[in-house]
Amino acid sequence: MRKLLFCLFFLCFPWIWLRAQQRIAFARLPPFERAVVCVKFFEGFHGKSCYPYVGYGHQLQKGEHFSSNMPEWQADSLLRADLMAQFDRFKCYGKDALLLSLLAYNVGTGRILGYGKQPKSQLLRKIEAGDRNFYQEYISFCRYKGKVLSG
């Protein structure tokens, strides 16, 4: 029994050590790179069934001709360009710019900034007012038609 436990420990130890190293490596990434990794993980790679979304959730715009079977490097490049465009839009919000950029990438800029009859989001209003207690407003975006979305 002792030998079995000893063998199991040494079989599992490298895997546990590797997972710990991956967490440390993730924590050492710059914030923008962590955002890219998170989007890739939760969004996943979109195939033909997800049209008009391609790559890692890029919504095709008028005049764009990206294929749904694009290579991973192109999808990565497109994701980074989209996130950087969102970041440029929200950079005036300082330390919250990346948070707002990621949220806008997922739900759309209009849901955050408001458009037409859609008012500015309560989350953005709290951030502008300096209120750091906006957790409930942030997680309210994880619902679609009343159902909680995974990711």
Q: Residue spans of the language-model regions?
A:
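Sec-dependent N-terminal signal peptides
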Residues: 4-13
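Alpha-helical scaffolds flanking conserved acidic
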Residues: 10, 32-36, 93-102, 135
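Long, amphipathic alpha-helical surface segments
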Residues: 16-46, 58-63, 70-86, 109-151
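Early exported N-terminus immediately downstream of N-terminal targeting peptides
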Residues: 51-54, 58
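Short helix-to-loop capping/linker segments positioned immediately adjacent to catalytic or ligand/cofactor-binding
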Residues: 87-92
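Hydrophobic pocket-lining residues within nucleotide cofactor-binding pockets
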Residues: 105
